[in-house]
């Protein structure tokens, strides 16, 4: 019998991803954004961080790569991943009768170097 996800030991990759999300969250809060929700999961996909930036709702994808091979962390967000992020955002926005202005940002870590890309995904 398979253990539920919350009881399974986390892999080194999962722990590194969690640490990256923690670092991204701290950085964004230092820039004045407020955390609304973390790891929003739905049938359509997952959004790492949901932040408020003034009146804008910001969907944040955090990506990590140990090297810049093949274009680095930001380039690893392919068309399929972008579509899943947009679907998850649409599901999240169903909570609002009048959805706020939104944008998709990416926090990319390439060998521990962090880059914040605002409006990285067009929707």
Curated annotation (Swiss-Prot):
Belongs to the UPF0102 family. It holds the Pfam family UPF0102. GO terms for molecular function: nucleic acid binding. SUPFAM superfamilies: Restriction endonuclease-like. Transmembrane segments: none annotated. InterPro entries: Restrct_endonuc-II-like, tRNA_endonuc-like_dom_sf, UPF0102_YraN-like. It comes from the Bacteria. HAMAP family: UPF0102. This is UPF0102 protein mma_0204.
């Amino acid at each position: 019998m398979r253990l539920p996800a919350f009881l399974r030991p986390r892999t080194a990759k999962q722990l590194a991803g969690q640490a990256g999300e923690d670092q991204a969250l701290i950085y964004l809060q230092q820039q004045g954004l407020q955390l609304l929700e973390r790891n929003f999961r739905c049938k359509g996909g997952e959004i790492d961080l949901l932040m408020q930036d003034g009146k804008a709702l910001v969907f944040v994808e955090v990506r990590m790569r140990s090297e810049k091979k093949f274009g680095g962390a930001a380039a690893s967000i392919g068309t399929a991943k972008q579509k899943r992020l947009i679907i998850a955002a649409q599901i999240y926005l169903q909570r609002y009768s009048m959805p706020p202005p939104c944008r998709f940002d990416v926090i990319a870590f390439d060998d521990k170097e962090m880059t914040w890309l605002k409006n990285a995904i067009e929707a």
